[in-house]
């Protein structure tokens, strides 16, 4: 059946989708390289008069290309209102109490590499970059160019802003940065998003095609049942071969109201349940597409016990007729099983009557089949 071909096409489509997403998955594996991230233990000391307050915690994360070593010094922010250190002429007021110092720089305005380069050229042993406002204490490993013997660490915005304001108030703050724990990250957030979207899309297409396949199988079974019913139903409709001497081939005889051609000898006509008759090749597609008699509008399929869903359309029925019925109901078989004998030997004869006074069928003849009992 044609529907089986459609189902096969849908299966091929699903298989092609599976291949495509499989290739995408293999390509994505090349992006899934393990990366190492090192956290930073920071011992921050606040010198207030003769008192020193220390704070120790794993509050930072090293940059991707940072030197991994221990470093200590005074924390020094840039002078002025702009704290991003994007200007090569940025000035850092170095403390006279320590030879080593760590630059405290705000994120934004330029790349991390530019900030680190400015601080390294000014003599900083390390660079502490704090995150954007509104990010809390969120940190991430920065991508930047490698600088020899320069430690690069990111801390959260809250901690960085707190240190900056205390320094502006005259508090001397020192920090000792040590290498913390190592974390291995197998996938970045871009790859995670890609995997999630790919998996969701793949799952959708799998379930979609499974659903369509189930519907196609159900529809195939329904068409098979309908084929059998139509074969049995059309077998109930009588067929007749028009022969020489029949009234239908007289000069004043009737013509088929579907093709408007006169009946000729050896024409095969089908007699409907309403007793109207037409060319078999004309009326069969008509019944499948309209379901009614062209003259009296009698619902032929309903009379024969066939229920067809309107929403399925008429084209599938015509396809079904051409692909199934024509293979099983050949004219020779139909003539053998359903042919009505000629008028002289049968008790049923076709008569054609003109009904010129009919208002509903002004141009269409009225054909009936009457029972005729031969005289003894």
Curated annotation (Swiss-Prot):
<comment type="function">
    <text>Has E3 ubiquitin-protein ligase activity. Plays a role in male fecundity through the interaction with the E2 ubituitin-protein ligase UBE2J1.</text>
</comment>
<feature type="domain" description="PA">
    <location>
        <begin position="65"/>
        <end position="167"/>
    </location>
</feature>
<comment type="pathway">
    <text>Protein modification; protein ubiquitination.</text>
</comment>
<keyword id="KW-0808">Transferase</keyword>
<keyword id="KW-0832">Ubl conjugation</keyword>
<dbReference type="GO" id="GO:0016567">
    <property type="term" value="P:protein ubiquitination"/>
</dbReference>
<dbReference type="Pfam" id="PF02225">
    <property type="entry name" value="PA"/>
</dbReference>
<dbReference type="InterPro" id="IPR003137">
    <property type="entry name" value="PA_domain"/>
</dbReference>
<comment type="subunit">
    <text>Interacts with E3 ligase UBE2J1.</text>
</comment>
<keyword id="KW-0863">Zinc-finger</keyword>
<feature type="transmembrane region" description="Helical">
    <location>
        <begin position="190"/>
        <end position="210"/>
    </location>
</feature>
<feature type="compositionally biased region" description="Polar residues">
    <location>
        <begin position="355"/>
        <end position="366"/>
    </location>
</feature>
<dbReference type="GO" id="GO:0008270">
    <property type="term" value="F:zinc ion binding"/>
</dbReference>
<dbReference type="InterPro" id="IPR001841">
    <property type="entry name" value="Znf_RING"/>
</dbReference>
<dbReference type="Pfam" id="PF13639">
    <property type="entry name" value="zf-RING_2"/>
</dbReference>
<dbReference type="GO" id="GO:0005789">
    <property type="term" value="C:endoplasmic reticulum membrane"/>
</dbReference>
<keyword id="KW-0256">Endoplasmic reticulum</keyword>
<feature type="region of interest" description="Disordered">
    <location>
        <begin position="328"/>
        <end position="376"/>
    </location>
</feature>
<keyword id="KW-0833">Ubl conjugation pathway</keyword>
<keyword id="KW-0479">Metal-binding</keyword>
<keyword id="KW-0472">Membrane</keyword>
<feature type="zinc finger region" description="RING-type; atypical">
    <location>
        <begin position="256"/>
        <end position="297"/>
    </location>
</feature>
<dbReference type="GO" id="GO:0016740">
    <property type="term" value="F:transferase activity"/>
</dbReference>
<keyword id="KW-0862">Zinc</keyword>
<keyword id="KW-1133">Transmembrane helix</keyword>
<protein>
    <recommendedName>
        <fullName>E3 ubiquitin-protein ligase RNF133</fullName>
        <ecNumber>2.3.2.27</ecNumber>
    </recommendedName>
</protein>
<dbReference type="InterPro" id="IPR046450">
    <property type="entry name" value="PA_dom_sf"/>
</dbReference>
<keyword id="KW-0812">Transmembrane</keyword>
<dbReference type="InterPro" id="IPR013083">
    <property type="entry name" value="Znf_RING/FYVE/PHD"/>
</dbReference>
